[in-house]
């Protein structure tokens, strides 16, 4: 069972066993060993009016998406003061007394609120993070009873932040459509009525960061994710199935754009779905804000363009709801098998210990 908060655990010298990952899942690269392999792309209004500049932006995005499924954007039009306010309020929320946070506990199937780890039900290992999440689009999905009422100003700022991020997402979908050689409205139309979920991640200092992860390796299910991260570092990406990892260089005020599974399928596999994780450290807490832009549940998932000589990556069209269900079912089954394997390993260790004991000690 997940602890109420990680505040108390952060001060301990050793990590609780529920957070300890198998050796093959542990971090291979330090949180601050930064790489500049992920391109940073400027989206100024002036540059987006120039055909030659747009062509160059599309070229960089194609290269980044074919390679990593990740790029960063600056000069994106989201006001720096709004970003600062959102970040400040998020840090203040996680600094509140635990009893304030758990008023919005989202366990038990509640939509939105506060939770520790947020690992899949049945998983053997927890993530070292606390989150607060809320659903913001379509507007009918907003349940303000699940939006924290502290610190003061939280709701008004998060509403404005959600609105601006939706605008940025629409702009990026147009650019991605052009990068795929499609009409600029192609991806937006494929989403039907875009969903938006905002997840604020807080990663406290960790006593043994080399043994755990802030967020396990995964791909996002949706179209794109816009991630705002502080300057501490911890977002990592792989392009070779987890053999090697890089730590993404934080850029002040930038948004990291991760392509999700939906975007991957719409491109017929040409663009990667970003394979990523978050690591933690013992020196600094870390904050990131992930805005997930997903298609409507009834949206069709199928390649928008199949180039000559290619085969479709999907056997046939499915809804996003069905795609998501299959992904969750697969993740739950993998978690179940991993948990069983771990339990069997512990049983084998205990059995070996027992078999090595003299008979008089066993019967004592």
Curated annotation (Swiss-Prot):
Top enzyme class: oxidoreductase
GO molecular function per UniProt: flavanone 3-dioxygenase activity; L-ascorbic acid binding; metal ion binding
Domain Fe2OG dioxygenase intervals: 191-295
Pathway annotation: Secondary metabolite biosynthesis; flavonoid biosynthesis
Details of cofactor binding: Binds 1 Fe(2+) ion per subunit.
Positions of transmembrane segments: none
Residues bound to Fe cation: 218, 220, 276
Coiled-coil regions listed in the entry: none
Residues reported to bind 2-oxoglutarate: 286
CC cofactor: Fe(2+); L-ascorbate
SUPFAM superfamilies associated with the record: Clavaminate synthase-like
Enzyme Commission code: 1.14.11.9
Keyword Oxidoreductase: yes
Domain of life: Eukaryota
Any GO BP: flavonoid biosynthetic process
Keywords, in A-Z order: Dioxygenase, Flavonoid biosynthesis, Iron, Metal-binding, Oxidoreductase, Vitamin C
Family label: Belongs to the iron/ascorbate-dependent oxidoreductase family.
Function field: Catalyzes the 3-beta-hydroxylation of 2S-flavanones to 2R,3R-dihydroflavonols which are intermediates in the biosynthesis of flavonols, anthocyanidins, catechins and proanthocyanidins in plants.
Protein name: Naringenin,2-oxoglutarate 3-dioxygenase
């Amino acid at each position: 069972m997940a602890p109420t908060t990680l505040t108390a655990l952060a001060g301990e010298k050793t990590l609780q066993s529920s957070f300890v990952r198998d050796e093959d899942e542990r971090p291979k690269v330090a949180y601050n060993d930064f790489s500049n392999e992920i391109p940073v792309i400027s989206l100024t209004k002036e540059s987006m009016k120039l055909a030659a500049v747009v062509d160059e932006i599309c070229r960089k995005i194609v290269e980044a998406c074919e390679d990593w499924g990740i790029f960063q954007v600056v000069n994106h039009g989201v006001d720096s003061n709004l970003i600062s306010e959102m970040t400040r309020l998020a840090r203040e929320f996680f600094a509140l007394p635990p009893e304030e946070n758990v008023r919005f506990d989202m366990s038990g199937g509640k939509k939105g609120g506060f939770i520790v780890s947020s690992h899949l039900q049945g998983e053997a290992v927890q993530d070292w993070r606390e989150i607060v999440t809320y659903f913001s689009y379509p507007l009918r999905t907003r349940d303000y009873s699940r939006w924290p009422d502290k610190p003061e100003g939280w709701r008004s700022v998060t509403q404005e932040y959600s609105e601006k991020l939706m605008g940025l997402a629409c702009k990026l979908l147009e650019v991605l459509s052009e990068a795929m050689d499609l009409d600029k409205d192609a991806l937006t139309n494929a989403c039907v009525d875009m969903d938006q979920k905002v997840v604020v991640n807080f990663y406290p200092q960790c006593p043994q960061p080399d043994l755990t992860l802030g967020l396990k390796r995964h791909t996002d299910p949706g179209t794109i994710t816009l991630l705002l991260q502080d300057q501490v570092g911890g977002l990592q990406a792989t392009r070779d199935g987890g053999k090697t990892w890089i730590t993404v260089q934080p850029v002040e005020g930038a948004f990291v754009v991760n392509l999700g599974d939906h975007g991957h399928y719409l491109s017929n596999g040409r663009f990667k779905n970003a394979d990523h994780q978050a690591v933690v450290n013992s020196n600094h807490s870390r904050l990131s804000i992930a805005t997930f832009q997903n298609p409507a549940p009834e949206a069709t998932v199928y390649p928008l363009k199949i180039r000559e000589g290619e085969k479709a990556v999907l056997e046939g069209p499915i809804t996003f709801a069905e795609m998501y269900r299959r992904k969750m079912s697969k993740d739950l089954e993998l978690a179940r098998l991993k948990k069983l394997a771990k339990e069997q390993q512990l049983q084998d260790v205990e059995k070996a210990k027992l078999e090595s004991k003299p008979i008089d000690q066993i019967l004592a």
